[in-house]
UniProtKB/Swiss-Prot annotation:
GO biological process terms, semicolon-separated: L-histidine catabolic process to glutamate and formamide; L-histidine catabolic process to glutamate and formate
GO CC terms: cytoplasm
Organism: Salmonella paratyphi B (strain ATCC BAA-1250 / SPB7)
NCBIfam families xref list: hutU (TIGR01228), PRK05414.1 (NF003820)
Pfam families cross-referenced by the UniProt entry: Urocanase, Urocanase_C, Urocanase_N
Active site as annotated: 410
Sites where the protein binds NAD(+): 52-53, 130, 176-178, 196, 201, 242-243, 263-267, 273-274, 322, 492
Annotated SUPFAM superfamilies: Urocanase
Pathway connected to this protein: Amino-acid degradation; L-histidine degradation into L-glutamate; N-formimidoyl-L-glutamate from L-histidine: step 2/3
An annotated Gene Ontology molecular function: urocanate hydratase activity
Name assigned to this protein: Urocanate hydratase
Localization: Cytoplasm
Gene coding for it: hutU
Length: 561
């Protein structure tokens, strides 16, 4: 690995109200960049890796230093441009423009392959930004806990009469994203068995209470699951092993889970999925010396993994892809029916997207957990009738360990995001919280992503691969005055399979911030309602009408009806 991608340095975001930069609008991206590399947050901070295989916050350490320096000196009417983790320019704009514009991992479609990206990465010309790694709004595994929880709850509604009590989930992967699964299953009332090939990841999840127990062997794991499901207890169990070995063995034994999914880093066969029979150190070494052979070995193991998932599905076990592109990898290795089980979005989440409901998150720049608890109470006050959301917030406070700066996520839609943002801004203005709040989201949202094997799989009108929508989302958030806006390629499912956009806005208590919040936190989720209404989803059309969206072609269609 080039020396510039490794540095033995501990990064933590500043806390409190003393500014390092010239304003909160530049202090916020500075702190969030640093927070992404906090050792309590990032998977491999010394190599700038935040999560998701090689999802980085900056291209190399020289670029990181230059970004920090640029943000520290950035004026209130300037915008910093980031190209794949490298600061390439500072331009005069205006005080309502974004302070940072980010483009990560974007390639011309014909060249949008892992092979070409890896060549560029080796030359120091590109960086994989994943979704929230390179856009500086990762908050640790909490960032995906509620989405996973909502998925499991909906699966319980659809398949098990509304409850997962006495049921168990079989899955794999305890990295930055997959680490949310055991806690989400527990919160949804289910037991879970999660296979993870790296002991260090299991140790981290045990320490942060995302996993309850570790089993010594497969027999031990199954005995624990049998006991806990019989007793109606929701306990999460981890097993250090390779999913490509364990799932076929479970099929051979005739073991029948109640739900099956997967969140290994299968999207990145060179760095994220350990081939069967290999040690992790061997995998890393071979990735450097024989990348093609390593990728093929990983994909062969993925094929075995998916064949086992297909076998569970054929038994009648609800089985779904959780968005890591493992079905595609298996299909490329000859598993022609790899897509016989669905992805999680068309199976469970799309009705939420139709109403602009998605992963709304916020972070207390003060570093004070009390600021988050106060905002939790404000959410309950404003969204007073949503008891499901209140239950989530109560469970989150009890069970979720803050990683880095205190943060919260809750899935809310078009109707509420603007109201919550304005309320948080008012809390900052009147001193109810001790420092500004930043509001952002995952790129996995209703209007900000095109990903035919994940968020836009099986769209009603066949527009799965149309990527105009995330581009429009990024452009609109820029025009609306988000504090920083990002446009990425390849997040979640790997090179060539997705394009997606993100935004973050600062609540600093000023009237100017309130005006920006009104625009951004309405327009951003509204693009999701627009996208789904355009695709012909009645629920989205109804939401658009209720919220007064001006969608010319949808209005014309409604008029004809």
């Amino acid at each position: 690995m080039p020396e510039s991608k490794y540095r033995q340095q501990t990064i933590r975001a500043p806390r409190g109200t003393v500014l390092t930069a010239k304003s909160w609008l530049t202090e916020a991206p500075l702190r969030m960049l640093m927070n992404n590399l906090d050792p309590d947050v990032a998977e491999n901070p010394h190599e700038l890796v935040v999560y998701g295989g090689i999802g980085r916050a900056a291209r190399n350490w020289e670029c990181y230093d230059a970004i920090v320096d640029a943000l520290t000196r950035l004026e209130a009417d300037e915008t910093l441009l980031i190209q794949s983790g490298k600061p390439v320019g500072v331009f005069k704009t205006h005080d309502n423009a974004p302070r940072v514009l980010i483009a990560n991992s974007n390639l011309v479609p014909h060249w949008a392959t892992w092979e070409h990206f890896n060549e560029l990465d080796a030359k120091g010309l590109a960086m994989y930004g994943q979704m929230t790694a390179g856009s500086w709004i990762y908050i640790g595994s909490q960032g995906i806990v509620q989405g996973t929880y909502e998925t499991f709850v909906e699966a319980g509604r659809q398949h098990y009469n509304g409850t997962l009590a006495g049921r168990w989930v079989l899955t794999a992967g305890l990295g930055g994203m997959g680490g949310a699964q055991p806690l989400a299953a527990t919160l949804a009332g289910a037991c879970s068995l999660t296979i993870e090939c790296q002991q260090s990841r299991i140790d981290f999840r045990l320490r942060t209470r995302y996993v309850d127990e570790q089993a010594a062997t497969l027999d031990d794991a199954l005995a624990r699951i049998t006991r806990y499901t019989r007793e109606g207890k929701a306990v999460s169990v981890a097993l250090c092993a390779n999913a490509a070995d364990i799932l076929p063995e479970l099929v051979n034994r005739g073991v029948r889970p109640d739900l099956v999914t997967d969140q290994t880093s299968a999207h990145d066969p060179l760095h994220g999925y350990l081939p069967s029979g290999w040690r992790w150190e061997e995998y890393q070494k071979n990735a450097q010396s024989d990348p093609h052979g390593t990728m093929q070995a990983a994909k062969r193991s993925m094929a075995a993994h998916v064949r086992a998932m297909l076998a569970f599905s054929q038994m009648g076990v609800p089985t779904f892809d959780y968005g890591n592109n493992i079905r595609q990898m298996a299909k490329e290795m000859g598993v022609e029916n790899a897509f016989d089980f669905p992805g999680f979005v068309p199976a469970y989440i799309r009705p939420l997207f139709c109403r602009g409901i998605g992963p709304f998150r916020w972070v207390a720049l003060s570093g004070d957990p009390q600021d988050i608890y106060k905002t939790d109470a404000k959410v309950k006050e404003i969204v007073a009738e949503d008891k499901h959301l209140h239950h989530w917030l109560d469970m989150a406070r009890e069970r979720i360990h803050f990683q880095g700066l205190p943060a919260r996520i809750c899935w809310v839609g078009l109707e509420w995001r603007q109201k919550l943002g304005l309320a948080f801004n008012e809390m900052v203005r009147c001193g109810e919280v001790s420092a500004p709040i930043v509001i952002g989201r995952d790129h996995l949202d209703s209007g900000s992503v095109a990903s035919p094997n994940r968020e836009t799989e099986a769209m009603r009108d066949g527009s799965d691969a149309v990527s105009d929508w995330p581009l429009l989302n990024a452009l609109l958030n820029t025009a609306s005055g988000a504090t920083w806006v990002s446009l990425h390629h390849g997040g979640g499912v790997g090179m060539g399979f997705s394009q997606h956009a993100g935004m973050v806005i600062v609540c600093d208590g000023t009237d100017e911030a309130a005006a920006r919040i009104r625009r951004v936190l309405h327009n951003d989720p509204a693009t999701g309602v627009m996208r789904h209404a355009d695709a012909g989803y009645d629920l989205a059309v109804e939401c658009a009408v209720e919220q007064g969206l001006n969608l010319p072609m949808v209005a014309a269609t409604q008029g004809k009806g």
